[in-house]
């Protein structure tokens, strides 16, 4: 949700200003980006990953934090144990209010070389045999109809990474 405050359909100058405010507030000294090409954006009217107080359950925000931690752990060390922890957290968040494909954007934002964003543009792109191998498209096509649960999400990610690792495409990562 923090990333959603600036990764939404607003002008780049506003995105930069929001990031600058966050950096100042939290004492972050990293360079503020000046361009956002290729970064998926949320609908500005749905830029949070949780509902307002009356629309969310008491553990919704804690569940998001658990997924964040599990995603970082999986990105750092991809083991069966870490995959299970990630899957448990992801599946718990999957059915929460305000969660759909946007959860894949959030994962991409925190570790873009590990997690694939499945927004509508990427789904269209990877489901086209002109962009990805035919066997990949056949394997994932049905999994792209609805926001996937963890097992399907990880399978899509793994198959996509495998296809990109063949070096048959000019693009090499998510």
Which residue stretches match the model-derived regions?
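An N-terminal alpha-helical hairpin/helix-loop-helix interaction module that forms a charged
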Residues: 1-96, 112-174
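Short hydrophobic alpha-helical segments that form membrane-spanning helices or hydrophobic packing faces
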Residues: 103-110
